[in-house]
Amino acid sequence: MKTKKFLLTSIFFALFIHLFSQEEFTYQLPPKEVIEIVDAPATPSVSIGSKAGKILVIENSELPSLEELSAEELRLAGIRINPATNGMSRASFSIGLSMMDLDGKNIQPVVGLPKKPRIRNIEWSPDEKHIAFTHTSDRGIEIWILDVSTRNARKLTSMYANEALGNGLAWLSDNKTLLFKGVPEGRGERPVMNLVVNGPVVQESYGRKAAVRTFQDLLKDSKDELLFDYYATSQIFRVSLEGSAKPVGEPGVIGNFTPSPDGKYLLVNKYIKPYSYIVPYYRFPQTYEITDLEGNSVRLLAEVPVADNLPQGFDAVAKGMRSPSWQSDVASTLFWVEAIDGGDPAAKAIYRDQIFLLKAPFDGEPIPSIKLRLRYGGFIWGKNDFALISEYWRKDRNTRTYLFDPSLPDREPVLLFERSTEDRYNDPGRFQTITNSFGFNVLQFDKYGKKLFLFGQGASPEGNRPFVDVYEIITGKTTRLWRSEAPWFESPVKIMDVDKMELITRRESIEVQPNYYSRLLKSKKIKQLTFFPDPMPQLKGIQKEMINYDRADGIPLSGTLYLPKGFTPGQDAPLPTLLWAYPNEYKSADAAGQVSGSPYSFTRISASSPIILVTQGYAVFYNASFPIIGEGNKEPNDSFIQQLVANAEAAINKLVEMGVSDRDMFAASGHSYGAFMTANLLTHCDLFAAGIARSGAYNRTLTPFGFQGEERTYWQTPEVYNVMSPFMQAEKMKTPLLLLHGLVDNNSGTFPMQTERYFDALRGLGATARMVLLPNESHGYRARESVLHMHWETIQWLDKYLKGK
């Protein structure tokens, strides 16, 4: 009897340990076909120097190794710093450079590059005779220079750049001087932290509202402040082409600096104490100051307080100076914007924002300029009496573009375009710019100064058909010059000659790798310039089709269907199918039904793409439309679950009707908000046999001051937050769910804890689930080992719960 009791007890504890212990697991490899796609070389990119008559061909890097991703990383004030280089961690690099003529001939590698280049921040000089770039070595970030005519590259100075707060590399308009943010000379050693703390961390609230969204990697204590100061403090240097470097001004926590177009002044943005523990560095108190090239103060423009108490709503902005910058087409005039309505979108106001101008020598009063009825969206400067300005209102998706005369600031601007940002079919495109003699971007006119040019994606019921339009300034008439034609997907890149209407485009088709072409619009001649090879020839024969269908309430939907080689719908047995989607909120049902993507784009599968499953015998319905609509006074999320299920039903019905898919073998999947969608679908319907959720958030009460497109707080609409949270309905989960998450996810709102706690709930309630946490990975997965293992997990899960049915 004792032996039997002992045996039962042993079995119980063995089962208990098996169920609740962590699995000792190593990285796994997916099938060979998947590995080959993940390891396929990246397609080169180009940078065009029209003045130089050259094209810079840029070779891009593959996936980093887990060892690279495991390097020490400091997470401070919303940023991640590599202390070895004083730059951003997890940066992507280019690994090679070549030069070629504009006619596509004479491609030659750049000589003199370091042995293992890690290139970023490529900047042409205004005259395009030189190119500056950075190379990240093991010791720091080096400044390099490339002579365009000789193709010779060399390190410019022994000083190291400081990119903790982003790139700080800028040419002066003299074409001989480069400015950069550097590590201060004599900085000393990194602060040594005392493990014994001096006291508790204290934060207080005295009735002042400070509602902020959830941010990651914030400062936590005085030790973090010391480290932030050490790595974020930089010194501006100016360096000649001969390599002689000179400091400009004093060191500080410099966010951005920009030289004036004439190269006589600098606009310098610095962050100052006291720092905040609830917002990232870019919301810290800061100053804007004009200095000369020696660093002497010309004028302190503004001291901006910490932005931790913005009014509620996406259209809320801080009081005081915003977005100061130089007017691109004149020597040295500053402009900025200030809120007239106190930054509060709930305030009743005819005008919301106002532009101010300040001209050199900056000793006068700022000149009040144009008032905007919505929020300032940006300038495109043209010439003294001609500029374009845009405004927007996110709540109702309205955007407007105006023609504005900077020389007559009191004159009412002329409305050019007004539309909903959701309405892609009527998007007029973006006005084209060129680089002027100062090295600044300005509008590209025809030779008479009477016409402008627009490039657009050309969204249509047939998919995207990129276009080039000409806009006549006097009449306001727009005429189409060119449009991409089937069976090609061709996008305009740059107008090289407005007289000849010579255009550089990027051209591709379903099975033809993207390459760059020269196209003469008048003669309709076309010439191929680059000949990049197909990186994935093994995908030849993969079938791709854009599918259109309707939701039960009549909303048009679409998605791109990928099928394995040789599969014939209606003849072959229906396939197990992965539905991949990402919900989007709309205020217009008409806009929600618009088609996105192109049926003619090249089938290039990125390393982490779910389309890779097509090599394993699955159909993949990619980027299926999942609109969540709330017209008028209705908010989209008030019917989030119902619309989510309706979208899924429509897609499944269509694919089953086509003979592509087996109704009992569907899996739902998505990343981030798509993962949130996946968990909700599996919770609230029985349409799927499995689900795979990557890097999601599942408990919306942990993002109580808004999320995604939701402006309302948890305390205003607790029922919406609770109903939308799959964590709150974890007991309803009856479908196998694979959860993946990067252990150091820094995306706002998607803490790894979201997946950990959701899995705990599912396990505690008896659901079938598996949680995979990827070490050293952020919101997207980058290490080769992680990406391959993710695919292994996905294939194992789907083979078991779809193919195994």
Residue ranges and their predicted role:
Residues 1-23:
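Bacterial Sec-dependent N-terminal signal peptides
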Residues 91-98, 102-104, 598-805:
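Active-site-proximal cap/loop segments of hydrolase catalytic domains
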